[in-house]
Amino acid sequence: PFYAVTVNGVSVDGELLKIPRLVWNIERGGGTILDSGTSLTVLASPAYRVVVAALSKKLAALPRVIMDPFEYCYNWTSPSTGEDLAVPVPDLAFHLAGAARLQPPAKSYVIDAAPGVKCIGVQEGEWPGVSVIGNILQQEHLWEFDTKNRRLRFMRSRCTQ
């Protein structure tokens, strides 16, 4: 199932990104849904470009790797030691209606794609078009969908432990 949510913005490392507001407006050809049946998050093209630019700028110290179907992948392994590099993943947050903030763990948007390779797990969607917050980004949270009162509640949870 999927549920419409109101996104007011997205931030990377606490900096609110300059994404046109109409991207989040269903009446202007945009909008956002939370979909448990879609794995990766898909952002409408204007939002995608801004979000991946901000994330990739923070990951610029890592060598880029080409790996379909992802556009932004990085070699996270030191060529000299074979160990994972200690490069911090920037924080990503979706600012929702009612001052709610969805701040997923890094593993939900910078995902392991192959040994030593991590990719930005967000895909580019059409514009105009609806953005989709997929189930990988929803992980490590408990969700409550109150359809009768049209409310969504969520909280961080170590569901896997």
Ranges and model annotations:
Residues 2-5, 9, 24-34, 41-46, ...:
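Aspartic protease catalytic domain
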Residues 15-24:
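Active-site palm subdomain of RNA-directed nucleic acid polymerases
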